[in-house]
From Swiss-Prot:
Known partners and oligomeric status: Component of the Sm core complex, present in spliceosomal snRNP U1, U2, U4/U6 and U5. The core complex contains smb1, smd1, smd2, smd3, sme1, smf1 and smg1 (Sm proteins B, D1, D2, D3, E, F and G, respectively), and is probably a heptameric ring structure.
GO MF annotation terms: RNA binding
Alphabetized SMART domains for the sequence: Sm (SM00651)
Keywords: Cytoplasm, mRNA processing, mRNA splicing, Nucleus, Ribonucleoprotein, RNA-binding, Spliceosome
GO cellular component: cytosol; nucleus; pICln-Sm protein complex; post-mRNA release spliceosomal complex; precatalytic spliceosome; U1 snRNP; U2 snRNP; U2-type prespliceosome
Phylogenetic classification of the source organism: Eukaryota, Fungi, Dikarya, Ascomycota, Taphrinomycotina
Organism: Schizosaccharomyces pombe (strain 972 / ATCC 24843)
Family matches, as InterPro entries: LSM_dom_sf, Sm, Sm_dom_euk/arc, snRNP-E
Protein name: Small nuclear ribonucleoprotein E
Bridged cysteine pairs (disulfide): none
Xref: CDD domains: Sm_E
Length: 84
């Protein structure tokens, strides 16, 4: 047995499910809108990575915030999901 650490690949759906279960706040980067980020908590998702985001806040490049509440974000618009 070697002393190497083996890395395990986690499918994206499993990662999103973990964020959902742990009620982890997330930051979502949008496709083709690089100056806007969405922050909130994931409340649900489907196999197309459409996401229901609770307590959503839109944050722009100048750190201006706009509260959106509960939103449905289409999976095609998501570039990156990051725990915050």
């Amino acid at each position: 047995m070697s002393g190497r650490v083996q890395k395990v690949m986690i499918p994206p759906i499993n990662f999103i499910f973990k964020l959902l279960q742990q009620h982890t706040p997330v930051s979502i980067w949008l496709f083709e809108q690089t100056d806007i980020r969405l922050q909130g908590q994931i409340r649900g998702f489907d196999e197309f990575m459409n996401i229901v985001l609770d307590d959503a806040v839109q944050v722009d490049a100048k750190n201006n915030k706009r509260e959106l509440g509960r939103i449905l974000l289409k999976g095609d618009n998501i570039t990156l999901i990051q725990a915050i």
